[in-house]
Amino acid sequence: MKIRASVRKICEKCRLIRRRGRIIVICFNPRHKQRQG
């Protein structure tokens, strides 16, 4: 999980989701997991 100021999709499989007011990216590739900090 990477904590970033700006999150974006890295590949086509990445999904942007809003959870508890935070934007997170989930993907089948674990390296693409991100969260806005």
Curated annotation (Swiss-Prot):
The keyword rRNA-binding belongs to this UniProt entry's keyword annotation: no
MF terms (GO), sorted A to Z: structural constituent of ribosome
Family note: Belongs to the bacterial ribosomal protein bL36 family.
Subcellular location: Plastid, Chloroplast
Keyword match Chloroplast: yes
Gene: rpl36
SUPFAM superfamilies: Ribosomal protein L36 (SSF57840)
Protein name: Large ribosomal subunit protein bL36c
GO BP of this protein: translation
Chief site of localization: plastid
Source domain of life: Eukaryota
